[in-house]
């Protein structure tokens, strides 16, 4: 079973990269974790065209039987404990899970339709790289909650 974050864009600034790498390393103690990045659409593309280009790249990275969770501002919000329970349910039976983060124009209808659930990290808009960090930290927190470890207090 793999747990993956599939996201549009790369952290060019390097601002969040060290923290993301640290939480990814910690997650590796509990589950096979992978961060997959696809390129952002060309800037000259219109919003719909950009979303479609990014959708094509995102969908190509998803396995046919992989459980897909899309991050979307209209998605469900959970507490960390409720999120941990959701992660437990998603990973039951050894099925691969991919949490998908779109680009600055969001996710296309095709990606949202492929998703089994949608998740909102916050009702506030987060920078995409910050959302990636928050998600990876919450995945790590979920693993520690599920194992009764003291990280989550």
UniProtKB/Swiss-Prot annotation:
Location of this chain's protein in the cell: Cytoplasm
UniProt catalytic activity: pseudouridine(1915) in 23S rRNA + S-adenosyl-L-methionine = N(3)-methylpseudouridine(1915) in 23S rRNA + S-adenosyl-L-homocysteine + H(+)
Subcellular location, principal: cytoplasm
Annotated binding of S-adenosyl-L-methionine, by residue: 71, 102, 121-126
GO CC annotation, single: cytoplasm
EC number: 2.1.1.177
Record keywords, A-Z: Cytoplasm, Methyltransferase, rRNA processing, S-adenosyl-L-methionine, Transferase
Family of this protein: Belongs to the RNA methyltransferase RlmH family.
PANTHER family: METHYLTRANSFERASE, RIBOSOMAL RNA LARGE SUBUNIT METHYLTRANSFERASE H
Subunit structure and binding partners: Homodimer.
Name of protein: Ribosomal RNA large subunit methyltransferase H
Organism name: Anaeromyxobacter sp. (strain Fw109-5)
Taxonomic path: Bacteria, Pseudomonadati, Myxococcota, Myxococcia, Myxococcales
């Amino acid at each position: 079973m793999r747990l993956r974050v599939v996201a549009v864009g790369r952290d060019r600034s390097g601002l969040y990269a060290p923290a993301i790498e640290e939480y990814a390393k910690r997650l590796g103690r509990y589950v096979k974790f992978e961060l997959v990045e696809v390129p952002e659409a060309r800037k000259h593309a219109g919003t719909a065209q950009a979303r479609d280009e990014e959708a094509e790249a995102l969908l190509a990275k998803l396995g046919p039987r992989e459980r897909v969770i899309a991050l979307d501002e209209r998605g469900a919000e959970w507490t960390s404990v409720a999120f941990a329970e959701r992660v437990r349910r998603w990973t039951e039976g050894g099925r691969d899970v991919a949490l998908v983060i779109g680009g600055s124009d969001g996710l296309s209808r095709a990606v949202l339709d492929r998703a089994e659930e949608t998740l909102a990290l916050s009702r506030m808009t987060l920078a995409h790289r910050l959302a990636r960090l928050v998600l990876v930290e919450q995945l790590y927190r979920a693993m520690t909650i599920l194992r009764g470890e003291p990280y989550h207090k």
